Amino acid sequence: MIDSAVTVEMRHLTRAFGSIVAVRDLNLTIAKGEVFGLLGPNGSGKTTTIRMLCGLIAPSEGTAIVAGVDVVKSPDLIKERIGYMSQRFGLYEDLTVAENMDFFAGIYGLEGPSRRGRIAEVVSFLGLNRRLYQLAGTLSGGWKQRLGLACALMHRPPVLFLDEPTAGVDPAARKGFWITISALAGQGTTVIVTTHYMDEAGRCGRIALMSQGHLIALGTAGEVAKQVGGKDLEDAFIILQERDEQEQEA
């Protein structure tokens, strides 16, 4: 029986591609309203982990429960319970901001007054009022980011996945984005983030540091740094990268 405060639980989660084990025996729990960071060098298993949690690929062993849904037994149901946003945003650039939101609201099954009401809520929450009739393709990186988040939030998902969401976005927009993420977490949304920015990783309540498919360290930024032997999170990340490179050369 899963604790009602736990929104995501991974049990011996493993994924192999032939002889290569991308994720090995991952055991984690993530609480409701937690901002949780997945951190690690390229090839560490972050993306594979997220793909399993989103129901896009099946685990080779183990399982995970996401917002009450088993990723092995009901992968299609997971898509109704999660929001996903990547650095590419997934927008239709030849549609306006309003048209993009209306399209995604329809994809998620919102109709009539509930559809219009939810769009209005998200527009207000993210400050998109003055951009509604602008083509998505003409937006700056920061505004595309807001629109991508708006589309991901349209169906009120209890779990939100952010895959390097601020890549290529200016510092001011990044700061504003994280204020929004904190507000979402305060409302009870569980947010799982991958990022290469150490300052952003430090904003997460907890971090799972991965390397070559293994969970290396878990805790706050300071705790993770200490577990790896670094003076801070950035130093710990560099130490881990150097270890990986030495092992690959050996």
Q: Where are the predicted features?
A:
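Catalytic Walker B motif of ABC-type/P-loop ATPase nucleotide-binding domains
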Residues: 160-164
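Conserved ABC ATPase "signature" region
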Residues: 102, 106, 111-131
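Conserved ABC ATPase signature
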Residues: 94, 135-139
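Conserved catalytic motifs of ABC-family nucleotide-binding domains
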Residues: 156
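ABC ATPase "signature
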Residues: 218-219
